[in-house]
């Protein structure tokens, strides 16, 4: 389960599918990490073992606890390079000992050559190549061990686009092809209590779905410090 009733319905299989790669992308502060943390909490409730690869070095254990995550039972890794992060992900998946791995985020998977290089050096296509190699290797193991792997990705703007969408995600096209489910998450409005903003109205579109019909969408509220509002969803349903 994703922690959102509406999104579980939109996904068509009652939540995120096991043995698959899932990509969640959206602008900054749209609720990508919150959605993943909610899914981890649900997975743990069902006795699952979860891992969080925090390439952004931004994991907040206090917030995670508020969302119902047993932090002491969560495998947490904060790798230094993109290679290290993907190697850890592959090792966890191959072990067959974890049910769900979250990588936060693809944009933060910086290749070693880029970290060790000079500021002005050109590293065109390095990250895309890294992702492509890793996913080719990973998908077989994911299928075999029936692990769910979720990649979080940010949206960037392409410069000088005249036609079509100027939005793009980092890390090349490999993830688009290898992901069985792609979720586009957006903040559509604010939730206020008096003058105070207490949360965000959120919309998730299922852009790609290989396990059920795609293009469904769900709307729900994410409250600051609390996560997805179950009550709000029940009332809406």
Swiss-Prot record:
Can the keyword Glycoprotein be found in this entry's annotation?
no
* Residues the record lists as binding ATP: 26-33
Kindly report the protein's main subcellular placement as a broad class.
cytoplasm
One MF annotation (Gene Ontology) recorded for this entry: ATP binding
The record, for Pfam families, names:
RecA
Could you mention a single GO BP entry for this protein? DNA repair
Has keyword DNA-binding?
Answer: yes
Q: Which PROSITE patterns match?
A: RECA_1, RECA_2, RECA_3
| Gene Ontology, cellular component aspect | cytosol
Domain of life assignment: Bacteria
Listed SUPFAM superfamilies = P-loop containing nucleoside triphosphate hydrolases (SSF52540)
Q: What does this protein do?
A: Can catalyze the hydrolysis of ATP in the presence of single-stranded DNA, the ATP-dependent uptake of single-stranded DNA by duplex DNA, and the ATP-dependent hybridization of homologous single-stranded DNAs. It interacts with LexA causing its activation and leading to its autocatalytic cleavage.
The record's similarity note reads:
Belongs to the RecA family.
What is the protein name given in its UniProt record? Protein RecA
Species per Swiss-Prot/TrEMBL record:
Neisseria sicca
